[in-house]
């Protein structure tokens, strides 16, 4: 299924990595998106199975600048989390459910990944998964730079440089650019996967898919 139009194509060509010679897997998600957490092992398998493909993460922005608390969204999230546990077998820590001081703003987590990608592009998916773990397993404060600096340190990044970049207007702008790119691609839900091949963009997944199914779609 192609999602390309001339207008979108011309706009997207400003992103140099979309002009790569090799086919490209584009994963669009948000580290605090429930089904993106469930999808993490599947997209990892896809990446590992297609070493001849370029791989890029685009941050979609689930609830940037969100103001609702985990108490506000607790029942809704708990329902989805139980579905994800049943479908994937992944563990989830429910400790944050019902916390009226925990604000569900996904922009800082997305920005944390954008900065890590700038400093060390090859870790972007692993860093994405580490941010997911901070939320879904460790119940870390996802608006605190300390959370992301700790992750950066584990990846061997210069934490002083990371903190400076994380708090910069450039990082905020680059994060918004990812959100805008996802919108330009026509993405309205996460996780989504787009394949770029021969200058065409094809929607391979809009929502959770097993890696086996996704690989079949990509190979067709």
Predicted ranges, named:
Residues 9, 22, 98-101, 137, ...:
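Generic anion/oxyanion-binding catalytic loop in active/binding sites
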Residues 37-138:
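Structural alpha/beta surface segment adjacent to cysteine/selenocysteine redox centers
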Residues 12, 17, 48-52, 118, ...:
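Secondary-structure boundary motif
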Residues 28, 32, 39-48, 133-220:
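C-terminal cap of thioredoxin/glutaredoxin-like
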Residues 1-21:
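Bacterial Sec-dependent N-terminal signal peptides
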